[in-house]
Every structure is written in C-alpha cells, then in structure tokens.
Amino acid sequence: DADITVAFEVSLPELFTVTSAEYEAMHGAWCKAIKVLPHYSVVHKQDWFCSEKYQPELQKDDLSFLDRSFERHFNERPYLSHKCYLFLTKTTKERARQQSNFSTLCRGRITPKELNHEMVVKFMESVEQFERIINDNIKLRRLSDNELVGTEKDSGLIEKYMSLTMDDVTCLEDIDLDARQMRIGDKMLCLHTLSDTDDLPAKVSTDN
C-alpha cells in the first residue's frame, strides 16, 4: 500500500547471558528508540524459529581432539534455529484507520496523499537515530535490496518467508490456508502474534 519500510537483521545476546541490569538497559533502549520515530510508524519484530539438525564441521583442519569430539557428540541433534528481524514502517493517519482486508488497488490513487519527499526524509533520519540508539545494546544490520528480494543465485528474505526456510536456495511450494492450520509444502506453520496493547503486561521488569 505504498508504505515505506526499512528492514534490519537483529543479533540478540545468547540465552541466559544477560544480567538484570543489562536487560533493563536493553529494555530502556527499545523504549527510547521507539519514541524517536514519527507518528503513525509501525515497529514489527519477527522471531523465526526453525527446527533443524546440527551439522558438524569435521572438515576443518584446525580442530583439536576435543573440538572434533564435540562436533561428533552433537551430530544431527535437533535444535531450534533462531533468526530475528525488525521492520520499521511509516504509514499515514488515513492508513492507520484501514482494516486488514482493505486494499488500495481498488482505488484510483495508490500512493497516499500525505506521503511526500519531506516526510520520507524525516522518517529516514529518525530510522538512523533509532539504529544508533539500539546499537548501543543490541546489534542491528540494515538489509540490502538483494537480501530482501534475492538475486539469481541466492534467495532473498521474501522467498525464504514464503517457503518457510532459511536456506540460501529455496523452492516456492504450495500454500494451504484453512481455518485450522497453515501449511507451506510439508511444513506446518505456528504463529504467536501480539498486536493489541491489552495483551501485554503493564510493566516489564527482571527478577532481582
């Protein structure tokens, strides 16, 4: 619908490696960064968890005896692979009132009237400020056009999203949507979505 979106890959700290003080600092950074975005901005964070099997790297020449034993020990063990992405989108006041089943393709004008060059410049400046604030605690890396739409050799994020895989080479498969399940190829999809502030706690804190 002609909205502007900037995509990032987020590198989060390992599980159980963050102290209470560091967690509070990260939470404060998120709150501070979100406040610099203009009105009618959408912050969309995605966490992808894919079931995979560990593939050892036994072909490396510099592995010690313990390293090789470690690789063999975890060979083909199942685990959840995690990827995190962040999307910052600039919408308009009119767009914010629209329902999810509305499409501007049914209208004579696709680009919103409020969207202009000055608004785009201000939004991109706020995105850069957002990025600087978050990078003090969490690593953000802006995705390029090729990483989003792909190239002739490598799949982009959109193709991976539509095929439920993180592989560099993807194959688009049939998508089955019904009232009870969502399936892409032979893979089942499970979504946990939060879009209403009433579903969130009033306060976020750590246990001291």
Feature-to-residue mapping (PLM):
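Extended, folded cores of ATP/NTP-driven motor/assembly subunits in large transport
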Residues: 1-208
